[in-house]
Amino acid sequence: MAGKGQRDHVILGNDQTGERIYLTSKNRRNTPDRLVLKKYSPKLHKVVEFKEVK
């Protein structure tokens, strides 16, 4: 049986609107700090920074 992998599922949230609409995965060995990605916000109708919540 395979062991637990290095990738974790993380939820991305926006501080301005409180949205938590993106789910992605990251390698916890390569990126131990919180993940920040620019994604589209449907409420603001523009691309903003979404930060790791979980």
Curated annotation (Swiss-Prot):
GO terms for biological process: translation. It comes from the Bacteria. One of its GO terms (molecular function) is structural constituent of ribosome. InterPro entries: Ribosomal_bL33, Ribosomal_bL33_CS, Ribosomal_bL33_sf, Ribosomal_zn-bd. Keywords: Ribonucleoprotein, Ribosomal protein. SUPFAM superfamilies: Zn-binding ribosomal proteins. The keyword RNA-binding does not apply. PROSITE patterns: RIBOSOMAL_L33. It holds the Pfam family Ribosomal_L33. GO terms for cellular component: cytoplasm; ribonucleoprotein complex; ribosome. HAMAP family: Ribosomal_bL33. Belongs to the bacterial ribosomal protein bL33 family. This is Large ribosomal subunit protein bL33. The lineage of its organism: Bacteria, Bacillati, Bacillota, Bacilli, Lactobacillales.
